[in-house]
Curated annotation (Swiss-Prot):
It comes from Bifidobacterium adolescentis (strain ATCC 15703 / DSM 20083 / NCTC 11814 / E194a). This is AAA ATPase forming ring-shaped complexes. Belongs to the AAA ATPase family. It comes from the Bacteria. One of its GO terms (molecular function) is ATP binding. ATP binds at G240, N241, G242, K243, T244, L245. Homohexamer. Assembles into a hexameric ring structure. The gene is arc. GO terms for biological process: modification-dependent protein catabolic process; proteasomal protein catabolic process. PROSITE patterns: AAA (PS00674). GO terms for cellular component: proteasome complex. Keywords: ATP-binding, Coiled coil, Nucleotide-binding. Residues 2-49 form a coiled coil. Pfam families: AAA, Prot_ATP_ID_OB_C, Prot_ATP_ID_OB_N.
Length: 515
């Protein structure tokens, strides 16, 4: 082989190597393209797949197995408001399908899969648990529906007042919903108020001690004489005269002589329990008494204090408000009557308008004891002011707290023109004067003393030295309280104002403020 042939052979070998390299690259590119095409085809097949339908399993309609061991079964399902009988896939065991569970239907409406129970959906309140396990549930508008329990829920204990979520078809209760947080409606506290902190209410305190404290602390004697303690006490009278303080002091006093520790005070504002949704107020009442029973179970004395009771338990059929009282009052009475077996629960109500409370609440056997907490007289006012105006305060020289209290109370209770608030006209057309003393309360007395203390603080800031509380500051405080009370009468409704303040209720037809 000559040199020319060798060069030709080398050139051909080089060309062959290049072609092989290109061929290898083309093979790799073709392989990648094939993989991409396969992936794209799979994606297209997935996108082209028919939609599947969610439904709620109701029951297995039929199920049998042929001679070849193949299952032939159908199921009743609900998709929204639509009920259907559909086949069950042969590879899905019909006996494992549970009522209330979510199932998937393919494009041919065949049950192909069972999912977990849905945890979402409309929330309903349980009104009643039927003997066969079905539930009577209601929505916020009071519309009642009869539903079955899902397989999971059927194993749990359910009672009236519980909340459940229901499926879209409104045929199944799926699961329990945690109760609402109603802690803001019920204030639970251990009060530190004692009867010694309350002035001017000795008679009322003695009566409530006899009615409440004595049965708790002398149970053996009550049993010996076959005497049952009262279920409840109603404190009524004009506002600001110590009804709430008395209730707190009772809860505190009940702990004396017991081994259970301090008493528990559950404070409820009547208007806060009113709810526009039917059944919600009743649920809150049940919740309050349930909590009282829980606290009383360990031996602690429990006071359920319902303030402004007239707003919650109005006389049924009066037309003063909506018909909500027709259901709230019976629910309250049911719970109150149920407290009979509990030795540690006492209901105390407070109201400015006893005339608006349903008579069934006030009858013997329920709120047995009714105590009027009236406006303080001169003697009671002196006892009240002693708690707020003491010798420990910076007082004017050569004068003690007792002397200042006497001057202050005499000024407030003066029956002369400089304390003349207005004239009121009764239903006979007779006019009579109303003085500051006629509308004074324990809260007003405290407010007057606080005004004088505030003046002293401001004066101390201005002068740079502690200002003394004297007759002048107290007189200024009374003048300001008198002026604000008089101005508030300008737009007052005569009948409502007289009822709230206990001045000839129902008879006042006109108010003529002093100019």
């Amino acid at each position: 082989m000559n040199d020319h042939d060798e060069e030709t052979l080398a050139s051909l070998q080089q060309a062959n190597d290049q072609l092989m390299a290109k061929n290898h690259a083309l093979v790799k590119a073709l392989s990648r393209a094939t993989q991409e095409m396969t992936k794209t085809k799979a994606q297209l097949n997935q996108l082209a797949g028919p939609p599947m339908t969610f439904a709620t399993m109701v029951r297995v309609h039929s199920a049998k197995t042929d001679g070849q061991g193949v299952q032939h079964a159908s199921a009743e399902v609900a998709a929204g408001a639509r009920r259907m009988i559909v086949p069950i896939a042969a590879n899905l065991q019909a006996s494992r399908l549970e009522p209330g569970r979510t199932v998937l239907l393919n494009e041919n409406m065949v049950v192909v899969s069972q999912l977990d129970t849905d945890t979402l959906g409309a929330v309903r309140s349980v009104r009643q648990v039927c003997d066969d396990g079905r539930l009577l549930v209601a929505d916020g508008g009071g519309n009642v529906t009869l539903v079955r329990c899902s397989g999971t829920l059927a194993k749990q204990a359910i009672s009236a007042g519980d909340r459940v979520n229901v499926d879209a078809s409104l045929r199944f209760a799926l699961s329990l919903v945690p109760p609402e947080n109603d802690d803001d409606l019920v204030l639970e506290e251990v009060p530190d108020v004692t009867f010694a902190d309350i002035g001017g209410l000795d008679e009322q305190i003695e009566r409530i001690r006899d009615a409440v404290q004595m049965p708790f602390q002398h149970r053996e004697l009550f049993e010996r004489y076959d005497l049952k303690p009262p279920k409840g006490v109603l404190l009524y009278g004009p506002p600001g005269n110590g009804k709430t303080l008395i209730a707190k002091a009772v809860a505190n006093a009940l702990a004396e002589g017991t081994d259970a520790g301090s008493g528990v005070f559950l404070s409820v504002k009547g208007p806060e329990l009113l709810n526009k949704f039917v059944g919600e107020s009743e649920r809150l009442i049940r919740m309050i008494f349930k909590r009282a029973r829980e606290r009383a179970a360990d031996g602690k004395p429990v006071i359920v204090f319902i303030d402004e009771m007239d707003s919650l338990l109005r006389t049924r059929g009066t037309g003063v408000s909506s018909d909500v009282e027709t259901t709230i009052v019976p629910q309250f009475l049911t719970e109150l009557d149920g407290v009979e077996s509990l030795d540690n629960v006492m209901v105390i109500g407070a109201s400015n308008r006893i005339d608006m409370i349903d008579p069934a609440v006030l009858r013997p056997g329920r709120l047995d004891v009714k105590i009027r907490v009236d406006r303080p007289g001169i003697q009671q006012a002196t006892q009240i002011v002693r708690h707020y105006l003491t010798d420990k305060l910076p007082l004017s020289p050569n004068v003690d707290a007792k002397a200042l209290i006497g001057v202050l109370v005499n000024d407030i209770y003066a029956q002369d023109e400089h304390r003349h608030l207005c004239d009121i006209c009764d239903d006979h057309g007779q006019w009579r004067p109303v003085y500051l003393a006629d509308v004074v309360s324990g809260a007003v007395l405290k407010n007057i003393v606080d005004r004088a203390k505030t003046y002293a603080v401001k004066l101390s800031i201005t002068t740079g030295q502690a200002a003394a509380i004297g007759i002048n500051l107290l007189a200024k405080a009374v003048d300001e309280e008198y002026g604000e009370t008089r101005d508030a009468l300008l737009d007052a409704d005569p009948e409502q104002w007289s009822r709230i303040n206990g001045l000839e209720p129902g008879r006042v037809t006109g108010i003529r403020p002093v100019a």
